[in-house]
């Protein structure tokens, strides 16, 4: 079995709704394989929501005008297609827009139902004069990719309902590039950089996570053909390897005082991993192991980024004053040997 170093994935937030993701190191050639798959999935297969049809009060079709409204129906539809919306409902839901003139109609005038949110309320939809009135019923559905107005048109559509083009994808733009990166003495490994820009309906981080989940599910179909087939196995991450090394350290490397060291050895604690598996209460049950020794152990473990089983991970040794003075207590010999 070939074992490859586990790549790391980091996110750099470039701007609102735009992030840059770096995956490295990848085996030679896998940068383009993974980059192209991620890009196509992000642009075409991330679930989203969009307006699929509208009904305007007093309007029978899109090739007409609304009395008292500056824009014709075609212009209004073009503006409505730019509404960024998210929906938690699997079934179609209806939003309502009602505006009495005079004034500018924006997406903020839309009243969405529970589970639906409009993310660009400043979007201009129409302009109504003093005597004008605009009432619109907007149907919102969930889907993926792009669906044309013709596809949204139902055979039993009620009179006056106008289908619109639906852009479900919440991802606006995805670019990627592959650079060379070094692993020990080799310089031919791939470094994949993916730049993702999304609509306010989803964060780039969630979009990438969704794309990854989709790809895993699809590639899993190929794996099921033969689960015993040989492939490249991903090894532990550098962080996991460093943690394992720290846990394997002998307690001698903690440079504890003689009292604390002898108490732990008598208890059969020889490695750091065995020490962090104990709670403060467990250690206090050890003969001659007191509060000062507990504080000393916590300080030494904190230097490695570790802690006892029931201690907070953010223990700060700098906040501890006079934890221990390093000197032997007057009754040290009696405690150790009697």
From Swiss-Prot:
InterPro entries: DNA-dir_RNA_pol_insert, DNA-dir_RNA_pol_RpoA/D/Rpb3, DNA-dir_RpoA, RBP11-like, RNAP_asu_C, RNApol_insert_sf. Disulfide bonds: none annotated. GO terms for cellular component: cytoplasm; DNA-directed RNA polymerase complex. The keyword Iron-sulfur does not apply. It catalyses: RNA(n) + a ribonucleoside 5'-triphosphate = RNA(n+1) + diphosphate. Residues 243-338 are annotated as: Alpha C-terminal domain (alpha-CTD). One of its GO terms (biological process) is DNA-templated transcription. One of its GO terms (molecular function) is DNA binding. Keywords: DNA-directed RNA polymerase, Nucleotidyltransferase, Transcription, Transferase. Residues 1-226 are annotated as: Alpha N-terminal domain (alpha-NTD). Its EC number is 2.7.7.6. The keyword Protease does not apply. Gene3D superfamilies: 5' to 3' exonuclease, C-terminal subdomain, DNA-directed RNA polymerase, insert domain, RNA polymerase, RBP11-like subunit. Homodimer. The RNAP catalytic core consists of 2 alpha, 1 beta, 1 beta' and 1 omega subunit. When a sigma factor is associated with the core the holoenzyme is formed, which can initiate transcription. The N-terminal domain is essential for RNAP assembly and basal transcription, whereas the C-terminal domain is involved in interaction with transcriptional regulators and with upstream promoter elements. Belongs to the RNA polymerase alpha chain family. HAMAP family: RNApol_bact_RpoA (MF_00059). DNA-dependent RNA polymerase catalyzes the transcription of DNA into RNA using the four ribonucleoside triphosphates as substrates. This is DNA-directed RNA polymerase subunit alpha. It comes from Beutenbergia cavernae (strain ATCC BAA-8 / DSM 12333 / CCUG 43141 / JCM 11478 / NBRC 16432 / NCIMB 13614 / HKI 0122).
